[in-house]
UniProtKB/Swiss-Prot annotation:
GO terms for molecular function: ABC-type vitamin B12 transporter activity; threonine-phosphate decarboxylase activity. One of its GO terms (biological process) is cobalamin biosynthetic process. GO terms for cellular component: plasma membrane. Keywords: Cell membrane, Cobalamin biosynthesis, Membrane, Transmembrane, Transmembrane helix. It is found in: Cell membrane. It comes from Halalkalibacterium halodurans (strain ATCC BAA-125 / DSM 18197 / FERM 7344 / JCM 9153 / C-125). The chain crosses the membrane at residues 54-76, 154-173, 301-318. InterPro entries: Cobalamin_biosynth_CobD/CbiB. It is a multi-pass membrane protein. This is Cobalamin biosynthesis protein CobD. It comes from the Bacteria. Belongs to the CobD/CbiB family.
Length: 319
């Protein structure tokens, strides 16, 4: 059974690299989004919003976990091969390496030819900030920050939970992440209602985000600005500057490896937001840096997969 579980994870990774998220295939996240919207419209009002937000999170996680457990269990009961196929498809739906790579490349291509209008438009699909006035450097920064943050959120974190608990736990992670992305804002409407989703998403991302940031530095020795020990200290110091307890690890590591500075001034619906800068680089970012961030992501994800199997093998050997 353990062998089937490992085969499902590897197959899921290959499926995502090959197919990504084809539009013709029903995606669990779409269902999660509809479920969250349904409960949010009914519960995000009146008193006890924080408590209702906790109820939203628990309800969504219970439904997603119960359905995935039942589907995986029934599939394995029919046949081991069917179980592996179903579990692989479910795990693949939680990771987005191909989608992230393609989205970043969609920004890099027009940026490389100085078509800033098209590059801004493509960037607006993957970031929440205003993009209509961004110059070449800021467009590249937006794409690089997206790749860096989502290397963990969109790829390594779901793989981490897939190793621990298979497709059901990977889907629980993705459901939490979806709740956070939909209601985990700090504005008046969601400050209380989205509190539980945001906090639980932080908890689930704490370990994989740090492993991902450290692996980025470990796997790219030639890109590091300093010896490993010093680089790790720089990583920890720079990551703390990010307002998120987890996103800073991937972004700080990427900034150190690309020799650029991430963070700074962003504008959201005309409102300026200042964020601490991470990294020590001074060069202006270009489309080439976006391509290099994708290469760093790909190598880090492969290294993370190897790390997970080594960790899993060690735990299996001592238990």
């Amino acid at each position: 059974m353990i062998a089937c579980h490992v085969i499902a994870i590897v197959s899921a990774f290959i499926l995502d690299k090959w197919l990504g998220d084809p539009k013709w295939l029903p995606h669990p996240v779409v269902g999660m989004g509809k479920l969250i919207t349904y409960f949010e419209r009914r519960w995000n009002c009146g008193r006890w919003r924080r408590e209702k937000g906790v109820l939203l999170l628990l309800t969504v996680l219970l439904i997603v976990t119960a359905l995935s457990l039942a589907l995986v269990w029934l599939s394995y009961q029919v046949h081991l091969l069917l179980g592996v196929i179903v579990e692989a498809l479910l795990i693949a739906s939680t990771i987005a390496a191909k989608g992230l790579k393609e989205a970043a490349e969609e920004v890099a291509r027009p940026l490389a030819t100085r078509n800033l209008l098209e590059a801004r438009r493509k960037l607006s699909y993957i970031v929440g900030r205003d993009t209509d006035q961004l110059d070449e450097k800021e467009i590249a920064r937006g794409a690089i920050e997206t790749v860096a943050e989502n290397t963990s959120d969109g790829v390594t974190a779901p793989l981490f939970y897939a190793l621990i608990g298979g497709a059901p736990l990977a889907l629980l992670y993705r459901a939490t992440n979806t709740c956070d992305s939909m209601v985990g804002y700090k504005n008046e409407r969601y400050r209380d209602f989205g509190w539980a989703s945001a906090k639980f998403d932080d908890v689930l991302n704490w370990v994989p985000s740090r492993i991902t940031g450290v692996l980025m530095l470990l796997l790219h020795r030639k890109r590091r600005q300093a010896p490993l020990g010093q680089s790790l200290k720089m990583l920890a110091r720079e990551a703390k500057k990010h307002p998120s307890p987890n996103s800073g690890w991937g972004e700080a590591a990427m900034a150190l490896l690309l020799h650029v500075t991430l963070g700074g001034t962003n504008t959201y619906q005309g409102m300026t937001s200042e964020r601490a800068k991470m990294g020590y680089g001074t060069k202006a970012m270009t489309a080439k840096d976006i391509d290099e961030s994708i290469a760093i992501m790909n190598r880090t994800v492969l290294g993370f997969l190897v790390f997970l199997f080594l960790l899993g093998g060690f735990i299996y050997a001592i238990t």
